Amino acid sequence: MNIEVEMKVLDERMADVVPVYATEGSAGLDLRACLDEEVVLQPGETFLVPTGLAIYLANPAYAAVLLPRSGLGHKHGIVLGNLVGLIDSDYQGELKVSLWNRSSEPFTVKPFERIAQMVVVPIVQAGFKRVEEFVGSSRGEGGFGSTGSH
C-alpha cells in the first residue's frame, strides 16, 4: 500500500538529500541533520536536531514514527531522546529529531549526517466504551512478567 505524502524543503541545502527508500524492501526513510556546523553531544546530553524538512500526511488513517538508526544506537549509544517520535497526520511543522547520547563518550553530529529513520504507519482510532467490569480472560490483571519466561 502506498500513499502520497506532501513534503516541504525548508532549507534548500536539503533539496539534494530528501528522504528516499534505500531499497525496495526498506520500511524506513533516513532523516538527516540540517546543521550549519558539527554539534558535540556530551554523555547524557540531548539535542534537538532540525531536518530542514516538513511533511503533511493529511490522512488521519496514517502517522509517521521517528526511530533511531540501529548503527548509531549500537555502535555509539545515540538514540532518540523521546525514544520514539510520533508525527500526527495533521502536523505541518519542521521534523526535528531529539538525539540523546546515552554512552560515556562524546559524539559528534555532522551536518547532513543520517540521524534517524521515519516510518509511515496505518492508524486506527479507537472508540472507548465505559464498563464496570471486563469479561474474564485467562490473563486477567497479570502484568509485567505474568505470562512466564520462554
UniProtKB/Swiss-Prot annotation:
Annotated residues for binding of substrate: R69, S70, G71, N82, L86, I87, D88, K96
Assigned EC number: 3.6.1.23
Coiled-coil segments: none
Gene3D superfamilies noted in UniProt: 2.70.40.10
GO molecular function: dUTP diphosphatase activity; magnesium ion binding
Keyword Metal-binding found: yes
Gene Ontology biological process terms from the UniProt entry: dUMP biosynthetic process; dUTP catabolic process
Pfam families in alphabetical order: dUTPase (PF00692)
Protein keywords: Hydrolase, Magnesium, Metal-binding, Nucleotide metabolism
CDD domains in alphabetical order: trimeric_dUTPase
Keyword check for Cell membrane: no
Catalytic activity: dUTP + H2O = dUMP + diphosphate + H(+)
Superkingdom field: Bacteria
Pathway: Pyrimidine metabolism; dUMP biosynthesis; dUMP from dCTP (dUTP route): step 2/2
Named cofactor requirement(s): Mg(2+)
Reported function: This enzyme is involved in nucleotide metabolism: it produces dUMP, the immediate precursor of thymidine nucleotides and it decreases the intracellular concentration of dUTP so that uracil cannot be incorporated into DNA.
Family, similarity comment: Belongs to the dUTPase family.
Name of the protein in question: Deoxyuridine 5'-triphosphate nucleotidohydrolase
Organism for this UniProt entry: Neisseria meningitidis serogroup B (strain ATCC BAA-335 / MC58)
